[in-house]
Structures are given as structure tokens and as C-alpha cells.
């Protein structure tokens, strides 16, 4: 019998090499050409992926699974079951923001098929356990993943709920995918006579921490990978069964190049974490692979597979998942508003997207990996993962309370168990990891809304434990939450996104109050009702916008169009109306109904341009209403309070112009169902303006009972008003020209509601406390001091404000900024004197204390009194992820006349350019007795800082962009 060898000419010519047991060598008396794969025909195969039934299936569902795969939708088109753990889908993109879902419609290369994908997120992860079939005729490419990748065309690609198919044109392979909850099934139909060389990649996309692979004869394998990306430790286990035995397998090696100190190039072979399996041709030449997935272990993956896909029958398994999807669409039939056409397809596709997340996380035996990285068993419920709660608390979860009450109950139990495992309710949980992406504690409104709709925990103990979890989560351990409790707002000079955090914390506190009220805890209900009023502490009565509080006052300068780090993925326009639990009071502060309507009109009719930093999420603009991101989603429905006709006008406009069943049919990230949930709920002629509050739904036209009998209204409402809600005096506003001053400075104080009394205390340096007084008019300070103010209650129905403090520094008038560097308008750090004001930046550039330059910085400082210089220093900041690097070079010059300058210091600093994470560095020149230059009687000091690069290099994701330089204090002694 002739021994079989495999010859892969492209691999041998490229940097990719397969290890010896399969391609060991070719005997010299045999012709290598005999072992080359047959060339791929350019003609369509008779077994094209467009097989009968696929188009019919797609028309039956009226779903376009490719919606959102282009533009910035970040969706995936592959096969998944409703809420399935498995999302078996092609991977066409390895990195980049528009590659977060692993696939982008503008691509024409498939790297392989992986079993997990995120639906519409703004951060990349998943893409686990990649399989890629080839016929062995691979390409000559430097990297092995490029060598095995295949081109594809969209006219040879199809998809529908639970199914995906594509022609891999480089190999003539027709690939089909289907899935169950925990299992994915691949089918690869080869050209007649072709072998299948299948690749398995553990390294795909994420940083690989650990992996393993086990063999069970020649028809089954299992293994795992532990990876790091958005989730810092993600465990993915699998068990795969092949429909035929493989005749060879091996681990891959890849050539790597390095250059030594002498400039000599060295080429070495290194083992990589990828494997290949050879399958010989058969009569039908179809290879199927069933792959069970688990977050627990390989045994769990095996159980999942055999519980859900015991039959090696692709069409049977496909039919089963299609039946599951049919039940979904029967739960919420399209409203009469959309009987046919694009509206119907939009509605069905939106509903489909909503049912792809969250994902089942427990195995069929109930086991799951918890947030403590331990294995637990879900008793009496199903465990879930992927909770994008900052997005989904708005419309998605209120909608699912109606469509999936039992599943909502499971999600509530999941939240509670997560709290047990790590001490906090989830913020943005992913595969048992807390990513801390986004802000707020928005699992709270999900639970509060569920209770409003009659969905309960199964026992009183869990009900009370959830309240304990809410309280614990709202109070820490993060410092920003502690500051919020102390001041009634998150200070913008200490924490980033302070306005958004204050507003969302206040809303979440309202939901805690409502939940406590519903389960009968009056004390907690009243405490959090008071905290929920903190949104007023960032409302500026002059501009009528929500603004950052800095040093007791409002941050200046203020531009409502500017995108900066005081807001979460937004500007002041897009957070102006976020007080969903207090719309009548917000309306009153804006002047009443007429004025409120006028301000809404301004929102929708403002210029669409924004200023400040680039924010890819701000899309789908109608004026400054940004439908492409969640903070705006409730705003069109605010017209329900003043002019319902405009609700209809803007809702209909958004539905018709910002949604379409096309690859670029979403105006922003899908965001785990929220973008689609907005459409579904809007199609029902309703919207939850304030989830968690019985009065928080607006509805019109046809009753929701057309969709679900539970939707005729809430159950009998809980008795409201079990406590007398007191009003808190808003935090007083301390206003001054500058934080650092020369000579003297006037201080004025005001309060939003005109508090009857404002108590003032002043603490000078050295802990000297001056006599307190009640504020009556602006007053003067002449020394460095801290001012503390408190608004006092004017009646029994009011509560004193917290103590608010502001620190002011009297600096020497000897330093004057003569020529100011060209700092960016969004990173002013307070203005022209920021580099000499005595206020030092901390290890977070987003607090606004660092001054930012998008290029070279050059400034000149005048010393009023000529000085013998002993030291000059300049502080710099680096965090390479947001494109901020230390200056590559800093120079100091001195002059006696401001015309002739002598260089006294130059430092090149490039050694840290690839180090991630925030860090600071001080460029320091010390002039002692040994210094030979002249630094006496210096009148002017010039500082020059050069950016790290002209353009960001290829090794960074921001390749081609301009690096930032962030600087703070210049100290001259």
C-alpha cells in the first residue's frame, strides 16, 4: 500500500511550515506534482450555497441577518439560536473598531469561522475556536492566517435566522453553518477529488493566555483557550466531532524574522498555537463538524453537544433552530403599521437582533463559571452573560419584560448571583468578567422595571438580598461613587464623565427608591428618593444645560456642542434632557411647558456639527439628537409632555430614515439589542421614558394587547407615596474667575432654588479656620484657602445641601505666560496660565487638568524679576491607548532680553513609547555650581516639547493619526 504524503507548495515557499508527522518528506522517486491539490475552478459549482430552501427560509422570516454588518452597526451574520451561547459566524476582520463583531460587509476575505461573537458592541472580544477549511492550495503569505484565508463574494453568501452559508472562492468550498443553544455545526462541501485540510486556531484575535488540545481517536477532539481582551480572563472550552476520520494532524510552525545588533537578519521557526487536520476525499466529499461550547470545561462542552445535536444531520439541526426562531416571531407579530415591505423587514430584523443577546452561560447540567472564576450550579434558573446594561436598560429590558417574563426573572437571579460572587451588581459583564465599560448601576432599573410589570423573585429572601445588593453597589467601592454621596455630584476635576455619572447615578437611585417602595422598605425608599434629586446639582440655571462641576462651580469655557470627557460618548446637548424620573421638574427649571418644547425644538434643529474630540458613536444626527448612541433615545418621546404631534413626526422620521434592512441600515452600534429594541417598541406606539417607574411609559394608538396579553398595562400598581418625599437644597455654586490667582480675587455664591441661607466657612493654609458667616454678597479672598459652603433648608420639607468645597491658590506674580502654546480647545486645563497655575495634574488626563496639544508645544514665560535659575521642570503625561505619548524631546531656553535665547537643556525620551497604561514623567534641568552655562538674571524661559512622532506608527491601532502631547506644570526655581 502506497504511503500518503501531503505536499503544500505554498506553505513550503512561504513563512508557514507544517511539522513533520504529516509532511515529513517526499521520497525522491516520487513526483511532488502528484500531490498538489487540484486547481480551483472559477466556474460556479453545482453545489452552490444558494441551495433550494435558503431563499424560501429567508422570505419566511422576513429577516436580513446582514443588517448592521456594514457601517458602524458591528453585527455578525452567522448562525445562532435565540439567546444562544454559540454564534457561529465568519471572521473577516482581525482588529479595528468596525471589526468588533468579527465581520464587516466591506471585507472580501474570510479568515475562518469562530463560535462566539458579540452583537453590535463598541469594543472587540470573542471570536473563539476558529476552524478554517482549505483544499491545501494555500497562498504564499508572510503570516499563516493570511496564507489560509479565502476570498468570498456577497453574491455567493446567504443567511437567515439560525443559518449561514458562503462559497470560499479560493478553494471551491461551500460552507454552511447552523447552531443550537450550546452547539454549532459546520458543513464543508469540497470539490470532487479534493482533500480537506482543516485548520484550528487558538490564537485568533485575542491574547492567548493558555490552551490545550486532546484527541479521542481520529474523529473527535476537545480543548480550550483562555484569552485576554475586553474580558481579562475568558474561558472557552469545546468538544468537536468530525463526520469522518482525519488521516493526519499536526501543530503549525511559522518563520519569524529578527534583526540582531549587527543588523543581521535571523530567521527562526517557532511553534504556534494552531493545528491542521487532513481529511481525504469521499464519495459525497462533505465534511461536517459538530462543536459543543462551554465556559466550564471540556466535559461540559461534550454534554452540551450530545444533549442538543446528537444527530449528524445538518438539515435536521437547521430545521430545529428555525422552529425556535419561528416561535420568537409568533410572540411579537408585526403590528398593522408594517403589514409588508421594508417596514416589516425592519421590524422582524430588529426583533431578531433583540433575541441574539444576552446569551445563555450555564451548561445543560446547570454548571457555569462565575465572576469569582469558580464553578457554580444554577439551581432553578438559567445563567446568562453579555449584559450591556448602559444600553439595554432603556428600551430593551422593558420590552423583554413583556415578551420574556420568565427569562427576565432568570436575568434578575443572574444579577443577584453575580453580586454574591463579586460584591457588586454587574455593570458590563462579559463571560464571567466585569469589564467596567460604561457607567451607572443600570442593573437596578432592569429589576425595578420588572417589578413594576409584575415579575418577581421567587422568594422574599432574594427580594431583600437584591435591595442589599443595590445599596452596596450604589455606595462603592469606586471613589467616584463616594464623591457623589459626599457632594451630591461627581466632581469633574477629579473624575471623568462626571456629568453623565451624576445624572445616571441619580436616576439609578430613583429606581432603588422605587424598588424599596415596592417591597415595603420605607426608610430606604425615602433615602434614595432624596439622592435621586442630585441631578439638579449639575443643572446650570443660566445656560439651562447640564454642566460639569469643577472646584465648586461650573467648568469653563462651556460649549454645548463640544464632545469632551465630562460626558459619556456625548456632548451637553445629548445629556441635556436626561432626568427621566423628574421630567416635570426639569420642565419647570427650563421655564415651563412652552419653553421646554422650544428647547426640544432647538435640539432637533441645531447644527449637526460637533466640536471637540472625535467620537465615532455620535451618529444618526437630527440636529444634535444622536440616534446612533443611547443617551438620545428617549428624547423624541419627551414631546409627549408638551406636543404629541411632534412625537409622531420625529418617531416616524427616525424609523423611516435611520433604519433599513441593509448592511449599513443601522446608524450606530446595535449595542446588544438596544438599537433594535427602540424600533420594536416604537412600532408598538410606546416607549419607556423612565424604566422603573409606573408612570414612565408613553403610548398612543393601538393597544399593545395586539402583541401580548400581558401588555394591556401593568398589573395593579403598587401603592405609591408611602413616604413624604422631601426636597433637598441643591448644591450651592461657587463662582470665581480662576482657581489660581495673583493678588486678590472675588468669590460669588448662588443656589439653584435660591436657598434662604448659604453658610460659608473659610479654611486658610495651615488649618487656620476663619469665622463662618452667611452669604449675602460677593466677597474677596487674598490668601490661599479652601471655601466650604452649604445651602440650608428653609422649611421642614427641605433638607440641607451637602457641604461643597472649592480651593483657591494664590500664586506668585513673578511668572507671566508671555507666549502661549497652541493648546487644543477641548483640553485647555483652565486656559493660558494652566502650565504655571500651581495646580498639578493627576494620573487621569480626562479630569481636565492636563493641557493637550495635537502637535508641537512652545511657550515663553516672563519672570517679572530677573532670577538666577536653579531648576526648570515640565511634567508630561502618557497613555498610548488614547494616542497620548510623552514628548520625544523637550528643550529649555533662557534669555535676558526676550530676543536672544540660549539652550540650557535638552532631553530625548523615547524608551517608554510602547508601554501601556497611564504614567507621568518630569523633564528636569538642574543648574548647580558645576553647570558652566549662564542662568543668572534670567528674564525669559522658553519651553519646547516635540510630539513623539509625526504620525502614529504601524504597531499602534491609531496608525497614521497624529499623537497628542499632554503637559502640566512648568516649575521654575
How does the language model describe each region?
Residues 192-194, 751-757, 866-869, 887:
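Short proline/glycine-enriched turn/loop motifs at strand-loop junctions of beta-rich domains
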Residues 35-397, 401-445, 451-503, 516-537, ...:
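Accessory carbohydrate-recognition regions in carbohydrate-active enzymes
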Residues 841-905, 909-911, 919-973:
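Aromatic, loop-rich ligand-recognition surfaces of beta-strand-rich domains
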Residues 710-857:
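Short, compositionally stereotyped local motifs that mark structural "simplifiers"
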Residues 292-294, 790-794, 946-948:
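Beta-strand-rich extracellular modules
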Residues 1-11:
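Bacterial N-terminal signal peptides that target proteins for export
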